[in-house]
């Protein structure tokens, strides 16, 4: 009988094949036993510098993995590969990763990033001793030189972490109100059952923006415990990922961006279905879910941030011939009145400068 892995390392791929093998090596070289690696390609057509597809790179990595772990007296690690037939966006890629994984815990690893040595051991030892839902490790942001040497930045604004423990509803509040931690799912060890619970509340959503915000909104709603640890577990590669600043030359690419509006539609729908009297005592153990006024204002502020970002990207990155259709699509997602209002604010601000 096959033993259930303790951890699933979940890796999404879209146009990141040049970095995939390096990413996989950082995963299978972990000094931890009883884990698996699950890779999902979101219909990616990319290739590495040697013309190899993600599927081919997985086969190479599996052979390397078998040899490395045998030589170092480590248990075998299976690398499983799944491929979407059509591009669905990060929310759905992570859904597939979660449903197809077998581990008790999940850690997300973006395919252009790397894990630090000993990352799985460090996070799991804390998970085992505390039983906490979310273990958040320290990440380092930086770039890689031509020899693949990592050059860290002095500051890391991508992986804000709260060092210490948070319990109950404060997990949500420390994130949404205090900004004590970032919503990224990478660099964290999270119970798989918590991911599945979160996805129960997220309908099929094609989106590449605000995906972490949507997922962590529900993860933090249902999480009972969080701990941030000093151990360095993750290397974040700056400005190369799935959603980096590339030219937008197709309406499908644009849809994956302006559909950030769907994130707030999902949350609004959930609130309508579950919201109770906001003045009700939060300490009652009746599984009541609702948001306080300051939390609602944070949500509205985040929505304003994303529509502002969408309009700026439309003006700066969408090719001219697609602009009329792109703006029409933006209005379909966000509402024409809202788009006009934000455009007016942007133009007014630019005139003042």
Predicted regions and their residues:
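Cell-envelope/extracellular polymer assembly enzymes that use nucleotide-activated donors
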Residues: 5-8, 36, 214
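Acidic donor-binding segment of Leloir-type glycosyltransferases
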Residues: 26-83
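Acidic metal-phosphate-binding loop of nucleotide-sugar-dependent transferases
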Residues: 88, 113-114
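Short aromatic/hydrophobic "clamp" motif used to bind/position activated sugar donors
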Residues: 106
């Amino acid at each position: 009988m096959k033993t259930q892995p303790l951890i699933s390392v979940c890796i999404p791929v879209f146009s990141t094949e040049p970095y995939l093998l390096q990413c996989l090596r950082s995963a299978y070289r972990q000094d931890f036993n009883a884990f698996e690696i699950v890779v999902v390609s979101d219909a990616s057509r990319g290739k590495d510098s040697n013309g190899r597809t993600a599927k081919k790179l997985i086969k190479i990595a599996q052979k390397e993995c078998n040899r490395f772990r045998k030589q170092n007296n480590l248990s075998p690690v299976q690398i499983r590969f799944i491929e979407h037939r059509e591009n669905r966006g990060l929310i759905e890629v992570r859904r597939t990763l979660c449903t197809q994984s077998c581990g008790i815990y999940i850690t997300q690893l973006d395919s252009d990033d790397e894990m630090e040595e000993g990352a799985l051991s460090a996070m799991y030892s804390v998970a085992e001793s505390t039983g906490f839902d979310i273990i958040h490790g320290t990440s380092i942001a930086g770039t890689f030189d031509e020899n693949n040497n990592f050059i860290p930045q002095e500051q890391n604004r991508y992986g804000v972490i709260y060092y210490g423990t948070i319990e109950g509803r404060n997990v949500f509040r420390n994130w949404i109100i205090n900004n004590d931690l970032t919503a990224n799912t990478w660099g964290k060890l999270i119970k798989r059952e918590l991911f599945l619970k979160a996805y129960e509340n997220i309908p099929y959503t094609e989106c590449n923006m605000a995906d972490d915000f949507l997922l962590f909104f529900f993860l933090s709603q249902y999480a009972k415990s969080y701990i941030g640890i000093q151990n360095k577990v993750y290397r974040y590669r700056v400005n190369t990922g799935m959603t980096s600043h590339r030219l937008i030359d197709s309406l499908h690419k644009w849809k994956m961006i302006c559909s950030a509006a769907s994130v707030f539609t999902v949350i609004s729908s959930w609130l309508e279905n579950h919201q109770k009297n906001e003045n009700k005592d939060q300490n009652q153990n009746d599984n009541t879910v609702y948001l306080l006024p300051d939390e609602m204002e944070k949500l509205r502020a985040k929505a304003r941030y994303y529509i502002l970002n969408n309009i700026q990207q439309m003006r700066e990155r969408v090719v001219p011939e697609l602009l009329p259709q792109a703006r029409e699509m933006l209005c379909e997602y966000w509402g024409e009145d809202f788009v006009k209002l934000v455009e007016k604010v942007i133009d007014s601000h630019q005139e003042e400068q």
